[in-house]
Amino acid sequence: AASDVSKRQGWRSQLNPLLQTDLMVIHPPLLFLFYSLCIMVTLHALAAILSPEEDAQKLLRERATPVARVGFAVGTLGIGLGGLWAYTVLDWGGYWAWDPVETASLLPWLCLVLFLHLRITPGRLPSRWTVALGVLPGWFAVHATMVTRANGVWASVHAFVGDGTSSERSQSAIVRLMEL
């Protein structure tokens, strides 16, 4: 019975050879952890905004900043290993290609960089900017997840599924976004 299923699935029966690498075990889980940490930073920033009795800067300093530091480190490692994978295994001609998925993963990372820099140099900008910037990494992490999972909506070198012959899926970007 199992052989019948694999015969019917054709190209889907085996993992793409480009994905059969040790970096596949490391890179995607690191980015998933990175996105999760970005969402945690956003939740702490929202708690700081919505908490009437506590100082927002104190909440950010005690809760969001340590998570942002870990998220920055994990994101740097995840994005860096993705670049190494692209250069060595995938032979895409470089570490970075400005692919929609790569760019989407860079956005929450840049937000964390800005957030941490504003935390290091307090007083240069009003504190509300730091709090507002703390909200952005989670939103961009959700956006990056959507871009990564929306295979076919944005042309991407990260599209490892599909054989290009499926006629039942709409080619309209709006319809594909609604399918998400």
Identify the function of each model-found stretch:
Residues 1-6:
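Short, small-residue-biased leader/transition segments that mark boundaries at the very start
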Residues 8-11:
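Internal, non-catalytic "lid/hinge" segments that mediate substrate recognition, gating
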Residues 78, 144-145:
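Alpha-helical transmembrane segments of multi-pass membrane proteins
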Residues 13-33, 93-107, 158-179:
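Short aromatic-rich membrane-water interface segments that cap or initiate transmembrane helices
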Residues 41-69, 81-97, 112-137, 147-163:
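Juxtamembrane membrane-water interface segments of multi-pass membrane proteins
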Residues 34-37, 67-75, 104-111, 130-141, ...:
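Hydrophobic alpha-helical transmembrane segments of polytopic
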Residues 21, 29, 35-37, 41, ...:
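Core mixed alpha/beta domains of very large multi-subunit molecular machines
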Residues 33, 46, 50, 74-77:
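Catalytic cores of phosphodiester-bond-cleaving enzymes
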